[in-house]
Curated annotation (Swiss-Prot):
It comes from Synechococcus elongatus (strain ATCC 33912 / PCC 7942 / FACHB-805). It catalyses: ATP + H2O = ADP + phosphate + H(+). Mg(2+) binds at residue 94. The gene is ruvB. DNA binds at residues 338, 343. This is Holliday junction branch migration complex subunit RuvB.
Amino acid sequence: MAIVSSKSPDPAERRSQAKTKPSVSEPQDSLVRPQAAPEESQRPEDQIRPQRLADYIGQPELKDVLGIAIAAAKSRQESLDHLLLYGPPGLGKTTMALVLATEMGVQCRITTAPALERPRDIVGLLVNLQPGDVLFIDEIHRLPKVTEEILYPAMEDFRLDITIGKGQSARTRSITLQPFTLVGATTQIGALTSPLRDRFGLVQRLRFYEVEALTDIVQRTARLLNTPLDQAGAEEIAKRSRGTPRIANRLLRRVRDYAAVKAPGPITGAIAATALELYNVDPCGLDWTDRRLLSHLIENFGGGPVGLETLAAATGEDAQTVEEVYEPYLLQIGYLQRTPRGRVATPAAWRHLGYEPPQASGQLTLQQLLTEPET
């Protein structure tokens, strides 16, 4: 299976075709953000993606659905139906597209929606697809409207309708395409338009991973990187990985670096814990910024409720960054609540940071939190 990455960063390329108080020390670049770092798609040793569906760890329901789809498509000698994968970043959407291409014995062309700025960008990709090829578009919710409209007949009828000329002299030309499979990936399925979403025959959600599955992923990656790692070490890394394989593999590489310099030999649970504490990743997967946000909420606002804009200003972060980058995991693990009146730190968050949760009698009732507007 050949992988073809299609990016159009410059015009020349187009023409040829992201009570113990929390530490207040300044953070390093976060290791627990799910967005891919640039080097993670460039270094040869990081090409650790599974190639077959049987090697893909986790997401059992998704694997069952796609296994049936692959077998059915092969039996009919057809291309797979178009597939939309959605869920938080770092859970394996790109990897699954590559696995599908391998299972079907075809090429996978990879691009992102922001790279498809002009109609000719998507047209160039579509006309060069071979029968059955997989076209993977990441961040598909960011497709320009004109590009999206070109995809409609391409997805439904494997046909391109191109308008040539302008005004009264304009005419439409249809180009027949080879049957292909479009795999779209998005973290914001609600941002997709209905006409585009309805053209996908399969719509599947990827969920956060359990510690057991992440432990298996860490052990597999360690074997591929020739890194000795015991069960306790793998579990220590897995439980700090925020349910995300991309983060698990990133933490493994940092622990491997630490062990190579400070503790040669197999990576144990103690070595992994020491290394990750050095990188400001605590046992729950929180980094410096996560702890600072919760600490501000507790120390400055009594645990809340407090409005998003106010909390963002107090922490020196942009409100959108707080809402889209930091809050999702805090909500997932039950350390933060969103209410109509604002953000509230849960008792679990108080205890995690070493504070004593306030008595319930001194807090607003749940009914008040759910009915009063955010300030």
